[in-house]
Amino acid sequence: EIPVFKKNVKRTKQFCKENNYHYKMWDLKDCEELVVEKYPEYICLWSEFRFDIQRCDFIRYLILHQYGGWYVDCDVYPTQNLDSLLGFDECFTTWSNDHKRKPYNAVMYSVAKNPLFIEIMKEVEKRVIEKQQIKQYDTWKGRLVFYTTGHHMLASIVPKSSIHELMLIYNEEKGIYISADNPYFYDENITSWWTDPQKKG
């Protein structure tokens, strides 16, 4: 177990308790049951993903479509009440120094059954079929993930009006300190799947 994940999950649970939000941690069994029972059209895609991180990305879109609510990565925790953000159909975050304002899928909100997430699922499927056949992506793990299930894929779908600066991102080891003016989330930006040199792209 990654210590930062354990620490920040505990903080998120406490935050939810204090703010009267329901908290759920999804395990692999939960995720696979959701695909089979609610999204059987994506069972083949689920098995076609080359990397587990693609499944981790994709399942969050299914969860938000099915149930709505907030998705928060394990290295992230909320820092202030989120009720003021609940007037949106969807809410995506971005790094405040990203001039292209690409949506960051570590933190996302949606109402249930939001058709935007159907578009996202279809775009993921299209890109996986296309890009996993390209030989260069055999060694470009990062690029494959970002362009099939990550922020580059989302940037082609999510309207700019749904993307907001809500994050404080701090990682001393990486030399990262980026903060919105009024951050709602603290992100330690662990990117645990990126540690193996073979995963670079």
Language-model segments: residues:
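Small-residue hinge/turn detector
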Residues: 57-69
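Glycosyltransferase-associated regions of secretory-pathway enzymes
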Residues: 1-56, 72-201
